[in-house]
Amino acid sequence: MVKIRLMRLGRHKLPSYRMVVVDSRVKRDGSYIELIGHIDPINGTNKLNGALAIEWLKKGAQPTDTVKSILSKEGIWKQYAASKKA
């Protein structure tokens, strides 16, 4: 199964994350299929490629709960739901 999940980066107590598409059997920080974006919770910045995320969701990639929440806040999940109905 292919998942969209977060990969942790950064040093101790200063995390940043990459949103990546991975095989569910791969370790959290293991190799990934494709990079969708960057998330920096310290500065509150998100740089996501919405079109790429929607493309992978249409292909059947399953987002984790945290990723789904982030996609909802960015408005990407709403775009995906609208494209799914059309």
UniProtKB/Swiss-Prot annotation:
GO cellular component: cytoplasm; small ribosomal subunit
Any one GO MF annotation of this record: structural constituent of ribosome
Protein family (similarity comment): Belongs to the bacterial ribosomal protein bS16 family.
Protein name: Small ribosomal subunit protein bS16
Pfam families associated with the record: Ribosomal_S16
PANTHER family with a match to the protein in the record: 30S RIBOSOMAL PROTEIN S16, SMALL RIBOSOMAL SUBUNIT PROTEIN BS16M
Cystine residue pairs: none
Key word Secreted present: no
Entries under InterPro entries matching the protein: Ribosomal_bS16, Ribosomal_bS16_dom_sf
Keyword line: Ribonucleoprotein, Ribosomal protein
Top-level taxon in the UniProt lineage: Bacteria
GO biological process: translation
Annotated source species: Mycoplasmoides gallisepticum (strain R(low / passage 15 / clone 2)) (Mycoplasma gallisepticum)
Secretion signal span: none
